[in-house]
Amino acid sequence: MNIAIRNPVPVRREEGSLQVGLDPNDRIETAKVFAVYGKGGIGKSTTSSNLSVAFSKLGKRVLQIGCDPKHDSTFTLTKRLAPTVIDALEAVNFHSEELRAEDFVVEGYNGVKCVEAGGPPAGTGCGGYVVGQTVKLLKEHHLLEDTDVVVFDVLGDVVCGGFASPLQHADRALIVTANDFDSIFAMNRIVAAIHTKSKNYGVRLGGVIANRSAKTDEIDRFNAAVGLRRLAHFPDLDVVRRSRLKKSTLFEMEPTPELKAVTDEYMQLAETLWAGADPCEAVPMKDRDLFEFLGFD
């Protein structure tokens, strides 16, 4: 079968926006699927990669899919920038039947399988369509049949129909946020996007992961107001910065008491998600209401 990267056909209208439709044959039915969202630069790739390792240490077979054209989601797992699905397809002139799994799947730390979807050239095409074709390619190669957990690491806080496409595959959406105005403002917009998607797909909000924050008071106040819950809290430690520079996950860094507390938190998060976190029925605030709600400390 040939996979051609072309502009998607808008097949569904939801609240006035055109969305990229999901072929029922492309649903991921053999694994628990999590989509990780959050403000750009908040640490989604760090969170996703360490969460993937935690799942693997529970004995689960894990696949992490990076959905950013920068293709830097998985480098702490693989120790290199993995080739993207788009790169692999271009190399065979988009004749996907000529690809082998090793052309676009890299095994990382502790057996976590890593895929970087990549994206079309800047200013062209639809990144969400690329994500859909990545899932289709994985199914063609039967790579999802031996997978227990799929983690989508999604570009920034983009919630257009295209980059919301991982929500079509996900069971639970997780939002990474810091304890500040900009991160929570972005989180509210993501909640709105997930609220919209949940009307037509099975995705539900799983909860919030507090990251790079000494405190969580503003996060917790917002969660209580809209119907979210905090699943985990990761403080802003220098070991996180150093792990990125060493191209390593936190589980590979020199152990210290504070680092053990963080890796234990990741293990607890993985256990909670695997056990089946109840969905959050959150209702987003209007932008102006949120503006008045936050801050003033």
Curated annotation (Swiss-Prot):
Binding residues for ATP: G41, I42, G43, K44, S45, T46, K70, N211, R212, P235, D236, L237
Q: Where does [4Fe-4S] cluster bind?
A: C126, C160
What name does the UniProt record give this protein?
A: Light-independent protochlorophyllide reductase iron-sulfur ATP-binding protein
Query: Where, by residue number, does Mg(2+) bind?
Result: S45
Q: Family membership, please give it.
A: Belongs to the NifH/BchL/ChlL family.
**Which coenzyme or cofactor does it need?**
[4Fe-4S] cluster
How is the co-factor bound, per the entry? Answer: Binds 1 [4Fe-4S] cluster per dimer.
Q: How does it assemble?
A: Homodimer. Protochlorophyllide reductase is composed of three subunits; BchL, BchN and BchB.
Give the EC number(s) listed in the UniProt record: 1.3.7.7
Assigned keywords, A-Z: 4Fe-4S, ATP-binding, Bacteriochlorophyll biosynthesis, Chlorophyll biosynthesis, Iron, Iron-sulfur, Magnesium, Metal-binding, Nucleotide-binding, Oxidoreductase, Photosynthesis
> What is the recorded function of this protein according to its Swiss-Prot or TrEMBL entry?
Component of the dark-operative protochlorophyllide reductase (DPOR) that uses Mg-ATP and reduced ferredoxin to reduce ring D of protochlorophyllide (Pchlide) to form chlorophyllide a (Chlide). This reaction is light-independent. The L component serves as a unique electron donor to the NB-component of the complex, and binds Mg-ATP.
Q: Which PROSITE patterns does the annotation name?
A: NIFH_FRXC_1, NIFH_FRXC_2, NIFH_FRXC_3
On whether ATP-binding is a keyword of this UniProt record, the answer is: yes
Question: Part of which pathway?
Answer: Porphyrin-containing compound metabolism; bacteriochlorophyll biosynthesis (light-independent)
Q: Which organism is it from?
A: Methylorubrum extorquens (strain CM4 / NCIMB 13688)
GO molecular function ontology, one term from the record: ATP binding
Its recorded reaction(s) are: chlorophyllide a + oxidized 2[4Fe-4S]-[ferredoxin] + 2 ADP + 2 phosphate = protochlorophyllide a + reduced 2[4Fe-4S]-[ferredoxin] + 2 ATP + 2 H2O
User: Which biological process terms from the Gene Ontology are attached to this UniProt entry?
Assistant: light-independent bacteriochlorophyll biosynthetic process; photosynthesis, dark reaction
Q: Which Pfam families match?
A: Fer4_NifH
Domain of life, per lineage: Bacteria
Q: Which InterPro entries match?
A: NifH/chlL_CS, NifH/frxC, P-loop_NTPase, Protochlorophyllide_ATP-bd
